[in-house]
Amino acid sequence: MAASTASHRPIKGILKNKTSTTSSMVASAEQPRRSVDEELSKKSQKWDEINILATYHPADKGYGLMKIDEPSPPYHSMMGDDEDACRDTETTEAMAPDILAKKLAAAEGLEPKYRIQEQESSGEEDSDLSPEEREKKRQFEMRRKLHYNEGLNIKLARQLISKDLHDDDEDEEMLETADGESMNTEESNQGSTPSDQQQNKLRSS
């Protein structure tokens, strides 16, 4: 019986039948139309941005930021009045020397504008501070001016170096003259009698 049942069944080959492939092609043609949206949704990710913002960047989170109170740098920006001064400097090339000399003589006694503005602005800021804070701020600004005045420091350093070198030269000259005098006295002592040597010692002391 086993042989009879095997003969009734058709033998299947490895290759697909033409009828099965055409039916699958018709089915697959209908599927892409429906599944294009499904495939795109599978391949792409949708982000819930509101949820991400709420999770990672909440409104009450401080991020560890803190306010830093630093003193203002000693930089003096040019104000509106100084723009005219810049224009004047551009035209100085065509200006006559005598006119320039008159302007310099007139401006010699005046204090620079940025210093005047700095003093006015510091007066406004100091009114909000307590006396202790004003004194502390004044001392700080004084120390900062000393620190940033490098030109003066360089001049002082050069003067000190030249003074040290001059002192060293004088010391060397004094040593040379002292050595020369001692050699002269020794030479004179060699040619003299012991009584003359005693007299020279008494004179030198």
UniProtKB/Swiss-Prot annotation:
The protein's role, per its UniProt record: Inhibitor of protein-phosphatase 1.
Taxonomic source organism: Homo sapiens
Record flagged with keyword Lipoprotein: no
Protein name (record): Protein phosphatase inhibitor 2 family member B
Compositionally biased spans, kind Basic and acidic residues: 31-44, 131-142
A GO BP annotation: regulation of signal transduction
Residues bearing the modification Phosphothreonine: 89, 92
Compositionally biased residues, Polar residues: 17-26, 182-205
Positions of the UniProt region annotated as Required for binding PPP1CC catalytic center, displacing metal ions and inhibition of PPP1CC catalytic activity: 147-150
Gene: PPP1R2B
Family: Belongs to the protein phosphatase inhibitor 2 family.
Complexes and interactors: Interacts with PPP1CC.
Tagged with keyword Magnesium: no
Modified residues (N-acetylalanine): 2
Region (Disordered): 1-44, 111-142, 163-205
PTM annotation (Phosphoserine): residues: 44, 121-122, 127, 130
